[in-house]
A protein has these predicted regions:
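Internal, well-ordered alpha/beta segment that forms a basic, Gly-enriched binding/recognition surface
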Residues: 86, 90-139
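Conserved nucleotidyltransferase catalytic core and NTase-mimicking acidic/glycine-rich helix/loop elements
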Residues: 123-371
Length: 371
């Protein structure tokens, strides 16, 4: 078990004590960077919270304890009664059990420890990433056909990011939002897929990020969060009446502690001179936030939103405040987009996805069959 610094351990112990008194909470597990031992001083704490109540889906809340940023990841016990969702694999494998009322979390953790690196389980996880990549490639293709070149480029790079998770899974690397580029490069190099990683960096524009650009993206993130938070605050009743997933996502992303944590982490990465990593972290976080915000804005404006043309939809929804669309495009690196160039980027993403889909099982067999 990783020994935590005092400034992390003390507030975390208090949170664990408080949560363990709740009738609904059956297990608590520390996962993520603090569990793995690769956390920075500005890293958030990730806490898996197993609850007995029949919540519709997994969701995350941001909490603050003595200045410590904590993400509480609530998961229903019902998920453990059938086939285990692949998205829980990393969390369970990394988890340090801090509280377990009836041994449910401990038992499922033991099972995952045995199965995690098996070819069969890795095949399950990688198949999920293939589906995710296909979804975003479909979005990119649709956006290109509809003439939204900004969205087409955005989703082409997102599709490549999803397919790069396959090498990460096969090499049993953690999938970390703040170490994605570092780990993806290592994994791609190990599997002879360096060109796939290079294509991702070029498509996403991350190969040209310097300190000035990373710092500008951080400023844009803060500015956009402020603008969007105002809208969320003005329409709090709509948020409360929203479907479960939209409601919990809006409350998470537009919690001031969430924004503060993102800026602190990005600033730390910039100071460590990992500029592309900082840019990717900000862009990836912002895209998830933007999609959630688009739902709220479309509901308030009573306009439909086409997620395949997300950038055009935001432009239409924000006609009264065009700064949101303009700054979003800048933050996501979409300011200079030519049709011919985007067409080639979408084709490049498609080639790489087809390649990884074809080679996936062979790579798993080659690199994991002896495990």
């Amino acid at each position: 078990m990783i020994r935590l610094p005092e400034k992390i351990r003390r507030p975390l112990e208090k949170v664990v004590r408080d949560l363990s008194t709740r009738e609904d909470v059956y297990g608590l597990g520390l996962y993520g960077s603090w569990s793995r031992g690769d956390a920075a001083a500005t890293s958030d704490v990730d806490l898996l919270v197993l609850v007995k109540s029949d919540i519709p889906d997994e969701y995350v809340e941001r909490a603050v304890a003595e200045g410590l940023m904590i993400d509480l990841d609530f998961v229903p016990m019902g998920w453990f009664k059938g086939p285990l969702p692949a998205e829980l694999d990393h969390k369970l494998f990394e988890a340090q059990i801090l509280y377990d009322r009836d041994w449910t979390l401990t038992n499922i953790k033991m099972l995952m420890t045995k199965a995690y690196g098996s070819p069969e389980r890795v095949e399950i996880r990688t198949s999920v990433h293939v589906v995710e990549a296909d979804i975003y490639l479909s979005r990119a293709t649709s956006a290109l056909w509809k003439g939204d070149h900004l969205s087409a480029r955005l989703f082409a790079s997102t599709a490549l990011e999803k397919i790069l998770k396959i090498p990460l899974e096969i090499t049993l690397q953690p999938i970390s939002n703040s170490h994605f580029i570092e780990k993806a490069e290592e994994a791609a190099e190990k599997l002879g897929l360096r060109d796939v990683f290079t294509d991702f960096m070029e498509t996403a524009g991350l190969n040209v990020v310097d300190r000035a650009l990373a710092e500008e993206k951080s400023r844009l993130f803060k500015s956009l969060w402020d603008e969007m938070h105002l809208v969320v605050k003005q329409h709090s009743q709509t948020v409360e009446k929203a479907p479960f997933k939209a409601k919990t996502s809006l409350k998470y992303y537009f919690n001031s502690a969430f924004m503060q944590g993102v800026i602190l982490r990005a600033t730390s990465m910039v100071n460590s001179e990992t500029y592309a990593e900082a840019a990717h972290y900000l862009e990836d976080t912002f895209l998830a936030m933007l999609e959630t915000y688009a739902w709220l804005k479309s509901t308030v404006e009573k306009q439909s939103v086409d997620y395949t043309t997300l950038m055009r939809s935001i432009e239409n929804l924000e006609k009264a405040n065009p700064r949101v669309h303009q700054n979003a495009a800048k933050l996501l690196g979409l300011t200079e987009v030519e049709k011919a160039k985007v067409d080639e980027l979408v084709k490049k993403a498609k080639r790489n996805i087809i390649r990884l889909r074809r080679e996936r099982k062979r790579l798993i067999k080659t690199h994991l069959s002896k495990s």
